């Protein structure tokens, strides 16, 4: 599982993990971005939520993850990026994984010391990827929500599992991935 504020490099590293280890990258942000473009009531609701920079409600997020975990491609493992974001989601994920006879092997906490660095990265990504929903106001709101609701989950996982690994995410992509890979290879050796 990858945890950290938006713009900390989770998506980039998740793609590298997915490719290297042959496990699916489950990015809730991507799932929501796809769904909000659909001409449905749910799509319009998601678009409004996302454009405000708010978090999607726990119930909907849990249903999305539950349906995604049911696919057979997650049996060898998976990379969770952007979920859980609240304590209710973390507790629901624990229940879902227990029901599948699985657990979270490791939680990578992506750390970026400077909020301005995150804002700069996200604005650059918005321009490169044409993300109209990544306005400075929406980005600041999502960073605030991360600090309020999601950052405390790192302590939850540290206290309940002791498997949190801090990653200094301001380094070059290759250095960050080398550190992640070393940890993951160590886990595979213990299985």
Which positions does each model-derived feature cover?
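Glycine-rich phosphate-binding loop of ATP-dependent small-molecule kinases
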Residues: 1-191
């Amino acid at each position: 599982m990858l945890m950290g504020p938006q713009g900390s490099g989770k998506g980039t590293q998740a793609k590298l993990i997915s490719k290297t280890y042959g496990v699916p990258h489950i990015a809730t942000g991507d799932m929501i971005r796809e769904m909000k473009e659909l001409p449905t009531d749910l799509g319009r609701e998601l678009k409004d939520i996302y454009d405000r920079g708010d978090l999607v409600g726990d119930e909907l997020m849990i249903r999305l993850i539950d349906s995604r975990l049911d696919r057979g491609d997650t049996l060898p493992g998976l990379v969770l990026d952007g979920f859980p974001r609240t304590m209710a989601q973390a507790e629901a994920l624990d229940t879902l994984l227990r029901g599948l006879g699985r657990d979270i092997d490791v939680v990578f906490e992506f750390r970026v010391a400077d909020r301005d660095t995150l804002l700069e990265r996200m604005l650059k990504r918005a321009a490169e990827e044409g993300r109209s929903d990544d306005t400075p106001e929406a980005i600041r709101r999502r960073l605030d929500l991360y600090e309020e609701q999601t950052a405390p989950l790192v302590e939850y996982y540290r206290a309940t599992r002791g498997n949190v690994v801090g990653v200094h995410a301001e380094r070059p992509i290759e250095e960050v991935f080398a550190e992640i890979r070393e940890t993951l290879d160590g886990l595979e050796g213990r299985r």
